Amino acid sequence: MSQRGLVVCRFTLCLLLTGLSLLGAAGQNKSTREREFFSDRIPSDRLQQYADLAVQWSQKYFRIDTTNPPGNEMRGAVFFKEILDAEGIENRVFEYTPGRADLWARLPHTIEPARRPVVLLNHMDVVTSDPSHWKVPPFSGAIVDDYLYGRGAQDMKNEGIAHLLVTIMLRREKVPLDRDVIFLAVSDEEVDSTGTEWLIAHQRDLLGNAEFLINEGGMNIRDNTRVKYIGVDVGEKSPLWLHVVAHGRPGHGSVPLADSAPNRLIVALNRIRAYHPPIKLLPIVEEFLRAQAPNEPPARAAHFRNMRQAIWDKNFQRESERNETLNYLLHNTISITMLGGSAQTNVIPSEAWANLDVRLLPGEDPKQFLETLRRVVNDPNVTIEPQSSDFRPANYASTDTALYAAIRRVSAHYFPGTPVTPMLLSGTDENQIYRPLGIHAYGFNPYTATQEENDSEHGDDERIRVEELRRGFRVLYDVVTSVAAKK
């Protein structure tokens, strides 16, 4: 064989060996990718069984009426306890007042050294419903056209079942945990948060100095073809409820009085309505809007990509006041929610009143905002006072944590190409109560929903797609194992 032929042969052999090596590496990488998450280790038949349980347990749980008021969350606690007892999982029920209870359960870590626990928090109470406006009874647990209907289907019995199922899976699959995983179902979130407040006051040690908490508040909106974004609740606005009272001359309704209390109240409320709190751009809002830019018309998309410049644009400032979402994200907001005056049509009262629902951005001073409103009204015959002296300052969690990184990583796996972005809620949730305890608390929802499905929360025909129930628990399982399990 010629030297040239030998060289060619050696070159060909080299290429062959290199190719085989690359194929082996590719196969190894593929195998690694396929087993990147703990759910990949579960046989498909068992995943199918878990998916069946998700639907079955959801139907049973949705049939339990925990309307608040009065709550009766003890019914939900008993439902959870029966399942947890059957699985041999440590749990305790605390009936802190008749019919109202919290349930705590724990999977202890199995690996040392252990890190701080992760809490799965959900509330068992739901808001009221009017059955006459529903397609099916709100507590029937009925499946119609591939949707499971029920009060709590979006807020948040659906997530409570995901939390429960993940806890069960961790136990059954014998996942090696280097954190305690705590399942916590509480009462009265929809009204006064007495369940969480009681637990922290009387059983705080059961939280085990937790590092992370996953709660409601996340929002993952999809259209017919794709998931538009994965929204993680990292902060909420704080409610400042105000009582406005106008004083004036009383008299007979047949003789109009220019300086009557109702007239003074109307003038005061018109001044409040005309007042536009200035824009305040929070970093989490800036990141959220930037992620929304691809879904917006060109002009708005340009603003969302450069919000620090947009907030100085007069046209955008006006849009931020007109657009409901931009308004709550960028401003302190004021809603007139209640009005009162005379008990009789022909009596001009000496007092007329209104209630305002004010929502303040994180970092805002309630006393300063109250003084601003008093200056806006500028009438010594009109008083504005807080309805309660108990003001809970708004707070938010850092996105520079292992849990937030896990949410990003898992979401990229299940929803490739979809942005994961922090969110600021217009309302409030119990994350605000847990963050001051040193816990990184996030609202993360493992399910996706169309805007219409999401809007059924607290509305008529609240529902969730059955397919979401069968899929979402796996997303949460991989998030939890990413921060609590040892590979």
Enumerate the predicted regions with their spans.
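N-terminal secretory signal peptides that target proteins for export/translocation
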Residues: 1-8
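Metal-dependent amide/peptide-bond hydrolase catalytic core
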Residues: 25, 29-36, 219-228, 232-235, ...
